[in-house]
UniProtKB/Swiss-Prot annotation:
Protein name: Cuticle collagen dpy-10
UniProt keyword terms in alphabetical order: Collagen, Cuticle, Disulfide bond, Repeat, Signal
Residues covered by region (Disordered): 144-372
Compositional bias per record (Gly residues), positions renumbered to this chain: 237-246, 283-292, 353-363
Domain of life: Eukaryota
Amino acid sequence: MKNNAKEDYRTFSLTTNYSRQMIYRCVTGLQIGFSLFSFIIVCVALPIMYNHVQNTITYVDREMAYCEVRFLYFYCIKFFSTLQRSNDEAALELQYGKMRMTGNRTARGAYGSGASHGFRPTAYGDEITGAPLETECPGCCIPGPPGPRGSSGTPGKPGLPGNAGKPGMPGTTPNQTCPLNQVREPPPCRPCPKGPPGIKGWPGFPGDVGPPGPPGLKGIDGEDGAPGETGPTGPPGYRGGPGAPGDKGPTPEGDLKEGPPGDEGPPGPIGAPGMPGLPGRNGLTGGQGERGWPGVSGESGEPGYPGPEGPMGGQGPPGEPGVCVCQNVDSILLINPGPQPRIRADDYNSDDGYGGSRGGGDRAGYQGYGRK
């Protein structure tokens, strides 16, 4: 019975897993199909849209070009037709517009010859009056002279002050001497040595307890326990029904004599299964399995608070006195000379900012002291 139950459970689990796999396969296939369908639609729709937009742009460009060509052609025809008329008539049209002019065009108009030029003859001396109208060829009109100069505009606001300029170069006066009381900026001080480190701060507070590590791997299973005691024998099964009667055998001839008893017949078929027996006792508890591997260590705690600021370092050595270098004079004057600090020769020579680039270090820096 137990084996049958296990087999049924395995069959059910296999059937369930198979049905799940089929469902997952169907869902995956549908997703792939929709993705391919969308990709195909995009691949087909984008070229069609691009072709439609390109055709629209081309059509608009052609229409615009046609309109421009037609516009230019129209005004070119008007321009060439204007050139066929006389210069005076074109100038009058440009000045007063296309209108019927009255008056003498030239001196010959007084004798009646002006009628052949499109003017209505009038008395000699009449002036030509009329408001300027739209010319027949606005694209070819000659621009008039520039108008009078307009009035000056409102003065603008003053601009922002510019950036300060760089300091100029010092003057070059021959035989210039440096004044004794001239205030000059002292040379930059040498970098002082670092002070002693401060007192070590208090240790920070301990960090929070890290999260528990993940569970360790499963330990090795212990050995199987000893088999339990055999359960009691179940009750006998139900007795089977009687078999069908066999065919009658042939009647022997002659006198009947009883023969010896025959051999024992084969056992009958197995009867129906009996009632299940009582469950047996549980076996002995197996030994304890081996200890699992240790879990991963937790994260480190937060850093502690910073310690208090250390005390200020000691005062550095005093700086060197200022120097004044005069131009065109081979001497260096000391301003307010005082006690000179004792500096090692190697430290002084290694500094390029004092005497190192002026040829000679300490000896060259104080060579002209007290000499003019």
